[in-house]
Design a protein with these regions (language model features):
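Short, charged helix-to-loop "capping" segments that act as catalytic/coupling loops
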Residues: 18-24, 47-49, 57-62, 81-86
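Amphipathic alpha-helical interface surfaces
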Residues: 23, 27-30, 41, 87-95
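Enriched for short, Lys/Arg-rich terminal
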Residues: 4, 13, 59, 67-108
C-alpha cells in the first residue's frame, strides 16, 4: 500500500531553510521512502510526542518527525531538523512546540 506524504508548512520551511543542498536532498529521499511501510521505519516517540515517529536522515544528526494516519493512508511530516540534545532548538523540542501551539494538526 502506498501512503501519501503531507508536509506541514512549518516542516517545509525548515527543509527549504537548509543551506546544504546535499543534506536537503538526502532528507527529501528519506521522506519519499515513507510512502512504503512508514510504520516500519524510524522509531516511535514517547511522552508529549506519543503517536509520532522519528526517522534519522542524512547521517545521524538530522531527524524527520512524522505521524502515520492508517485510516487515511497518509504520512504527516511535522518537523525536519538537527538533533541537538539539551538545546531549545532541538528538533524534538521544536516538534513539541508546534503541537502545543496547534501549528500542526494532522486531523485537519
Amino acid at each position: 500500500m502506498t501512503y501519501k506524504i503531507i508536509i506541514a508548512p512549518t516542516a517545509l520551511k525548515m527543509l527549504k531553510g537548509m543551506s546544504d543542498r546535499r543534506v536537503r536532498d538526502l532528507i527529501i529521499k528519506r521522506i519519499d521512502d515513507l510512502t512504503e511501510e512508514p510504520e516500519k521505519q524510524g522509531k516511535p516517540l514517547v511522552a508529549e510526542l506519543s503517536g509520532y515517529r522519528s526517522l534519522r536522515a542524512a547521517g545521524q544528526r538530522y531527524r524527520i518527525v512524522y505521524r502515520v494516519a492508517h485510516d487515511k493512508i497518509m504520512v504527516y511530516i511535522i518537523a525536519v531538523g538537527i538533533r541537538k540534545e539539551g538545546s531549545s532548538m532541538d528538533i524534538y523540542n521544536l516538534a513539541k512546540k508546534l503541537i502545543r501551539l496547534r501549528l500542526f494538526n494532522p486531523s485537519e
